[in-house]
Regions:
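TOPRIM fold recognition
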Residues: 64-178
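Phosphate-handling DNA/RNA-contact segment within nucleic-acid enzymes
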Residues: 2-94
């Protein structure tokens, strides 16, 4: 809390005990930074869906449930969330266990480069699911109805890891400087 004002954010756990943390003003993590791997119970799955961030994974779940509320098929595959394209090398060994990999990466330079890197390694096993939202930066923009031409500039991170204390501080107001 800062000046007796509470702040909140949604946190998404990763494999190293850290959290990806988001709110309207903040995008960061509570260290350590790592991927998130969601494995289904029971028999190992042949399919894995790969997302750049959890703000792409959550819209995927929403779209699946909205399109088919009776049978959204959420447990027929595992999920890997990179939490940053810089974590791409960390998922390659995990992805070798799957016969099919659905790639829901962003339609920007970083997302396309990551896709091409994976395509070189996994070939036809990698399926480009970003074609479903090709006129949008990512699945979240698709769900919100914000085409690429209307999409806000992505948040630029100078640091991958920010402290939880810094997360609790609201952003500084910035006005027009002349």
């Amino acid at each position: 809390m800062n000046a007796d004002k509470p702040y909140f954010a949604i946190g998404f756990p990763n494999m190293a005990g850290g959290y990806e943390v988001r709110n309207r003003y903040f995008k960061g993590c509570v260290a350590p930074k790592e991927i998130s791997h969601i494995r289904q119970q029971g028999e190992p799955r042949n399919m894995c869906y790969l997302f750049e961030g959890f703000m792409d994974y959550l819209p995927f779940l929403t779209i699946r449930i909205k399109n088919n509320p009776q049978y959204p098929r959420l447990t027929t595959q595992d999920y890997i969330i990179l939490n940053s394209v810089s974590n791409l090398a960390k998922v390659e060994s995990l992805l070798t266990n799957y016969t099919q990999i659905g790639s829901f990466l962003d339609n920007d330079t970083a997302g396309r480069n990551a896709y091409e890197t994976l395509k070189a390694k996994f070939g036809e096993r990698l399926l480009d699911k970003s074609l479903y939202y090709r006129d949008y930066k990512d699945l979240n923009d698709y769900l919100c109805g914000k085409p690429l031409s209307q999409s806000a500039e992505p948040i630029k991170q100078e640091k991958q890891v920010q402290s939880a204390r810094r997360m609790m501080q609201p952003p500084k107001k910035r006005g027009l400087k002349m």
